[in-house]
Amino acid sequence: MKSTLKKRWGRIALCLCMANFACAGMAQTNKKLDDQVINTMKTATQFMMDKVSYNGGFVWNYLPDMSRSWGEMEAKRTMVWIQPPGTPSVGHLLLDAYHATGDEYYYEAAQKVANTLIWGQLECGGWNYVFDFAGENSLKSWYDTVGKNGWRLEEFQHYYGNATYDDAGTMEAAKFLLRMYVEKNDPAFRPALEKTIDFVLKSQYPVGGWPQRYPLMYDHPFQGKKDYSSFITLNDDVIPDATEFLIQCYQAMGLQGVKEPIMRAMYLMISLQQGEPYAGWADQYTVDDLKPAHARSYEPRSVNTGTTVRLINLMMDYYKLTADTRFLSGIPAAIRFLESMKLPESDVKKWKRQSTNPEAILVPRFVDPDTGKPLYVHRKGSNVKNGTYYICLLYTSPSPRDS
């Protein structure tokens, strides 16, 4: 019996010993892998900060020899892009790396990015899509040459000189500055952050929404239509992003003065929903009567099905924040609207729009808010000189921007 127990204990001891060796080996392997990852991160970050950035600023893409670079359009070397995945996005990534590693190098790199953004902050407190370390005349020259030839990118065909909420530009920079401030309560970032908060509060309409650009300007009518930059804007999450930023300021800084503007913006979302049977949301609204409005030449006055899906989810988020069932009340009608716009299976096959999700449906992107008819966007030509967008009721293009 003793012999049997000794054998069993011997086997157990051997197994435990082997397990310990295995764990030790795995720990060494994991540590080696961790070290490799950390070293690679550091090398890549040093290259980006020392070789790629311009005074701590970034665009989107670069040739390997750095001879050319691009944001949403080709950029000068001295330009800094704000739209994601531009300079604020890099700043967020550096702070994330700092949290993951505890290495102060990443925080110092994030500081450099933040100071670059502060340099490019407009007097009004927001940011344009891009700024230029070579000065405003250099930026105007870019708009007059590169920007004005941006077919589809009509927002670059005119230099306003003001700030934009479009494409999360100002809000991405604002959220990064907020993170930088609360990370160590560094007072150096407080003035720029307060300037940004003041910009967001001043630019909010009394009804609760925000324009695409601010200070308000009306000097770029396009193809016979009014300048749309002053319209109340949901497109690209202008209102949701501004609201989220104020919520973050309320949570992180305890600012009581932002609570009422937050609530005003949230409850506006209920008012902006259209009545049945086309009970969705538009991308833009006129300020005086909250009616759907146009934007760029390929963005007609319409109810947008994609925006409607986004707003359904947002309304559920606002319900979770407030417990107010009014945020849920319009969701059934919005779902009925989306289901009513379902295109036949023949269109799904014809245009090769099959989804891996068996519950997904194909719908037109734009819907006439008065008639409920789909509005399909097409284009012809190849550039700003000979090209144009046009809208019709037939889905005939093999590569439309409408679904």
Predicted regions and their residues:
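Bacterial Sec-dependent N-terminal signal peptides
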Residues: M1-T29
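A compositional/structural signature marking long, glycine- and acidic/polar-rich segments
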Residues: R264-R326, R336-E339, L343
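Conserved small/polar residues in nucleotide/adenosyl-binding loops
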Residues: Y395-D402
